[in-house]
Amino acid sequence: MSATMSSARNSVVSLSSNGSVKVETRLVSNERSSSIQQEGAMLPSSSSKDDDLLSTSSDEVENMATRTLQQLEESTSIISANSDDDSVKKEKQAEKDVEKGNGKEEKANIQNEFGVCGWILTILSYLLIFFTLPISACMCIKVVQEYERAVIFRLGRLMPGGAKGPGIFFIVPCIDTYRKVDLRVLSFEVPPQEILSKDSVTVAVDAVVYFRISNATISVTNVEDAARSTKLLAQTTLRNILGTKTLAEMLSDREAISHQMQTTLDEATEPWGVKVERVEVKDVRLPVQLQRAMAAEAEAAREARAKVIVAEGEQKASRALKEAAEVIAESPSALQLRYLQTLNSISAEKNSTIIFPFPIDLLSAFLQRTPPKVEEPPSLPKKIRSCCLYKYPDWVQGMVGSEGGGGHGHSHGGGGGGLGSSQGAFHPSQAGSGPSTTTTSGRPLLRSMREAQFHSAAPPISAPNQSQTSVSQLDPALLIR
């Protein structure tokens, strides 16, 4: 039993001089354990029950040792945490003591710096208050609101204790002055600033700044007008920050720009006792031409997307129609059902006229027939045509050929000559002896008179090697051919 316990872990706990706990844990060496085993072997062998008891006791000892180690570790961590808290408290107390000492020193310095004249004026002021007590009470008692603080100056020097308020505070007439400071969050608008961006685009940007006074005494003693100074600083900061940004970054990263501007202003106004809470970029005004260009670009992009969407829709619709056509081609009953559905939809629209499509199979028989040929009138033999036009000069033949198809003149005189046939061809029998007074639609009168003179001077035409035949016996239409 003693050998087994000696083979367990041995823990030594010691308390150092500085209050920390040291835990030392060591194991029995292998040589000692082997010697213990040899001594146990020399002893008379015990029963199996004794061996079991020894093994269980050794396990219990090990468990107890581990538990004690854990408890010691927890206690050491607690002690270290307490020591840290104590050190922090001591540091804070030391800082408070230093501040109190500094305040006492400042108060003593202020009292010493008043001098003899200061003390004389102070005593006279207190005497004046005492002798005019009912009236002076109204002049000495002042009130500041919950959101205000009063910074008091006596003979031009800051009074110890910092700003007064909220509530009632007393001042000494004639030697004390005070200034109220509002501690609420204030805001001002940064006027629009003309800024040249990084990509050489001129824009007008305005913003809003939210700030508050964090230290009333510093805001009065270190800067003349904290709000005005912060406003001027915000204008220059806005120009400096946005000058390093592109137009796309100005339009998309407004939150990052606002955060960067707020950080910069807060660091710059900290010596003034001002805390910048928030900065917001209100508007980025672009030139009119640039706005139009951007609008046109956006519209073109939207149209392109719309075309892509329409094309994709048509593609899907065509695929669906293809599949529907394949299904309808496989089953003729589906086509008949579709036909009936179409008729039903047409009749449901309250139309007075319903169109029933005629089957194309029945129209195919009519479409295969060829139209009848139009018979041409018999042409005049070449000999007769050459005979008829042989006696006239070339300029007459050209005139007759060009005017033959378009003449529509009608004779209004008895013996006048001219082209008076319905086909517009010349007939020799119509030649007269005198000038013709015939008028032709679309033909000048002088031209008709020349044709009449020519017809009167033309000799009779006779066919060679045949009997005398007058041209008037021929059809005027054949003369053209």
Swiss-Prot record:
UniProt keyword Transmembrane helix present: yes
Residue ranges of the region described as Disordered: 1-67, 80-104, 403-481
GO molecular function list: cholesterol binding; sodium channel activity
Subcellular location: Membrane
Ranges of compositional bias, category Basic and acidic residues: 86-104
Ranges in coiled-coil conformation: none
Residue ranges, compositional bias (Low complexity): 1-22, 433-447
Pfam family of the protein (one): Band_7
Main location: membrane
Keyword list, A-Z: Ion channel, Ion transport, Membrane, Potassium, Potassium transport, Sodium, Sodium channel, Sodium transport, Transmembrane, Transmembrane helix, Transport
UniProt cross-references to PROSITE patterns, sorted A to Z: BAND_7
Regions that span the bilayer: 115-135
Subunit-level organization: Component of a non-voltage-gated amiloride-sensitive cation channel complex (also called the degenerin channel complex) composed of at least the mec-2, mec-4, mec-6 and mec-10 subunits; the complex mediates mechanotransduction in touch cells. Interacts with mec-6 and mec-4.
Its biological purpose: Subunit of an amiloride-sensitive cation channel (degenerin channel complex) permeable for sodium, potassium, lithium and N-methylglucamine, and required for mechanosensory transduction (touch sensitivity). Positively regulates the activity of the putative mechanosensory transduction channel. May link the mechanosensory channel and the microtubule cytoskeleton of the touch receptor neurons. Required for the function of a set of six touch receptor neurons.
Family per similarity comment: Belongs to the band 7/mec-2 family.
Protein name: Mechanosensory protein 2
Organism: Caenorhabditis elegans
Gene that produces this protein: mec-2
